[in-house]
Swiss-Prot record:
Its main location: cytoplasm. Pathway: Cofactor biosynthesis; coenzyme A biosynthesis; CoA from (R)-pantothenate: step 4/5. InterPro entries: Cyt_trans-like, PPAT, Rossmann-like_a/b/a_fold. Its EC number is 2.7.7.3. It comes from Nitratidesulfovibrio vulgaris (strain ATCC 29579 / DSM 644 / CCUG 34227 / NCIMB 8303 / VKM B-1760 / Hildenborough). This is Phosphopantetheine adenylyltransferase. It catalyses: (R)-4'-phosphopantetheine + ATP + H(+) = 3'-dephospho-CoA + diphosphate. Keywords: ATP-binding, Coenzyme A biosynthesis, Cytoplasm, Magnesium, Nucleotide-binding, Nucleotidyltransferase, Transferase. Homohexamer. One of its GO terms (cellular component) is cytoplasm. The record marks 22 as: Transition state stabilizer. ATP binds at residues 14-15, 22, 93-95, 103, 128-134. Substrate binds at residues 14, 46, 78, 92.
Amino acid sequence: MDDERGKLAVYPGTFDPLTMGHVSLIRRGRQIFDRVIVAVAMDTPKTPLFSLDERVRMAEEVFADHEGITVEPFSGLLVDYAERRGANVILRGLRAVSDFEYEFQLALMNRKLKRHVQTVFLMTDYQWLYISSTIIKAAASLGGDIKGLVPDNVYRRLREKYGYPYPLNPGLALSTEADEDLPPSL
């Protein structure tokens, strides 16, 4: 095996948007591998909130000062992309047992397609276990404050997408008149 190949890992995803869970895993992956490519998926069955260019740009901004971490768009089969880039490792994160079955199936299929490409799993840091891009978008779209759960540049972009400032939570009364009929709080 070529000595350089074991030093490069590909971390794929849609990153719509990039979360602090992703950032943590990428940084930890960089501690293991000489280089990590953050591979932003062009082809996705999901309808992204952010365009491919926006997702790539946001990730580039986050990792601009991180030596050994690069961001690239990719399309097609991940194992083909990894092979073209000279990587024999796909880096994946696991949040919970529920992630394992799907990730295990993907790893087996990738291994079947390209035997020399290995999948390495890292457990997500405990403080990010409940975070996913889908949950972040849902909370932000309803006015939830997701500051600290995504990088600052992503936070600003989400505010732009959903309106600045975030809209009030529609479940809250806009007037205190409705509260007058309620018993006082304990």
